[in-house]
């Protein structure tokens, strides 16, 4: 047996050709390509007839038929690179685990970008995530959830760091302050909105560490009670128990 394995290995090494890590060997790839247009190369052009409204070839068309949800709205990603495919706004979950077999042909984004990842549910509920820094989802701090301060956006907030709202540090556009900015909405600086009768800013109420710890304990206790109720409910179902079990006794004959 070992001689056969050694002979097969020597043949592979003697061939000198590496196997192309393509995923076209799967039997269901032609069905996905013909039915949904998945797996097409990045350089395949978009069908002009389909873009105008109708393609007579339908699924048999060799060009791409992108749906509105799959069309990329920007030409670059957050890292400054061009999106690899039409799904440039979503991160490939298999790529994050090192298990994506499509490579450059993948319809999703192959880069680790926290701005495009969903929010961590565990961190948002209790302020604690068991995965810590290794978590692949966003950990949004409570300070980041505060609305922006209108007074600070206009140029000055009298409360400063004591303000209950968030102070977003952005440079005001000098052209916009002078009356006109040629960049419009695409300007990198801030265009202050001069809203009259702004509400008076309020002082931020900071919680002590003891209060925050009590809130975390209450959240954990509520989660434990919820798990206990679920375990009791599942155990009742396993024993065949019900709401009216053992409480109903029908009348016998002759009564």
Swiss-Prot record:
Function comment: Component of the cleavage factor I (CF I) involved in pre-mRNA 3'-end processing.
Matching SMART domains: ZnF_C3H1
Protein name: mRNA 3'-end-processing protein yth1
Annotated family: Belongs to the CPSF4/YTH1 family.
GO molecular function annotation: RNA binding; zinc ion binding
Species, as recorded: Aspergillus oryzae (strain ATCC 42149 / RIB 40) (Yellow koji mold)
PANTHER family from the UniProt entry: CLEAVAGE AND POLYADENYLATION SPECIFICITY FACTOR SUBUNIT 4, CLEAVAGE AND POLYADENYLATION SPECIFICITY FACTOR SUBUNIT 4-RELATED
InterPro entries assigned: CPSF4/Yth1, Znf_CCCH, Znf_CCCH_sf
Signal peptide: none
GO terms classed as biological process: mRNA processing
Localization per Swiss-Prot or TrEMBL: Nucleus
Pfam families: zf-CCCH (PF00642), zf-CCCH_2 (PF14608)
Major localization listed first in the record, in broad terms: nucleus
A cellular component term, taken from the record's GO annotations: mRNA cleavage and polyadenylation specificity factor complex
Keyword Cell wall biogenesis/degradation attached: no
Biased composition (Basic and acidic residues): 221-239
Compositionally biased spans, kind Basic residues: 246-255
Zinc finger regions, C3H1-type: 41-68, 91-113, 114-142, 143-170, 172-194
Keywords carried by this UniProt record: Metal-binding, mRNA processing, Nucleus, Repeat, RNA-binding, Zinc, Zinc-finger
């Amino acid at each position: 047996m070992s001689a056969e394995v050694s002979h097969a290995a020597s043949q592979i090494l003697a061939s000198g050709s590496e196997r192309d890590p393509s995923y076209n060997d799967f039997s269901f790839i032609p069905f996905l390509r013909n039915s949904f247009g998945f797996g097409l190369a990045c350089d395949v052009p978009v069908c002009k007839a389909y873009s105008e409204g109708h393609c007579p070839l339908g699924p048999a068309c060799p060009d791409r038929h992108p749906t509105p949800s799959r069309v990329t709205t920007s030409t670059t990603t957050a890292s400054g690179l061009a999106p690899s495919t039409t799904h440039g706004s979503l991160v490939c979950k298999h790529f994050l685990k090192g298990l994506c077999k499509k490579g450059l042909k993948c319809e999703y984004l192959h880069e680790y970008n926290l701005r495009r990842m969903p929010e961590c549910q565990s961190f948002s509920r209790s302020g604690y995530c068991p995965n810590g820094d290794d978590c692949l989802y966003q950990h949004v701090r409570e300070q980041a959830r505060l609305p922006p301060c209108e007074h600070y956006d206009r140029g000055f907030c009298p409360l400063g760091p004591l303000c209950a709202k968030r102070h977003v540090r952005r440079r005001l556009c000098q052209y916009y302050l002078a009356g006109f900015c040629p960049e419009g909405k695409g300007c990198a600086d801030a265009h202050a909105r001069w809203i009259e009768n702004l509400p008076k800013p309020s002082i931020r109420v900071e919680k002590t560490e003891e209060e925050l710890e009590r809130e975390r304990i209450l959240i954990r206790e509520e989660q434990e009670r919820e798990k206990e109720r679920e375990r009791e409910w599942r155990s009742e179902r396993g024993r065949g128990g019900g709401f009216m079990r053992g409480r109903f006794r029908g009348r016998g004959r002759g009564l």
